[in-house]
């Protein structure tokens, strides 16, 4: 009897990762975890869009937020200031063309001033 319970418990534990929450891209970008929310990075025609999403997959209001994208472009580091653009998006213009999947870090500063970082590899 104990063996059956042990086997059943092991099967349940091994199945747990299947229930893990994986954030989904709603704007065609890449989504990573950053502090208490998810960050989606979208690069379009020299513009960086950063969408903030809560753990319920709902867009977050970005009023009072600011950000900085530090991206590696053509082997050089480029800093792009991000400002609110719409209700749930921060946006900034790059100095030139961007790859569709830029690599780097996005730093988000909420109104409380506690900076969080999202790494995009």
Regions found by a protein language model. Name each.
Residues 15-121:
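Intrinsically disordered, low-complexity terminal tails/loops enriched in metal-binding residues
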Residues 2-4:
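Bacterial Sec-dependent N-terminal signal peptides
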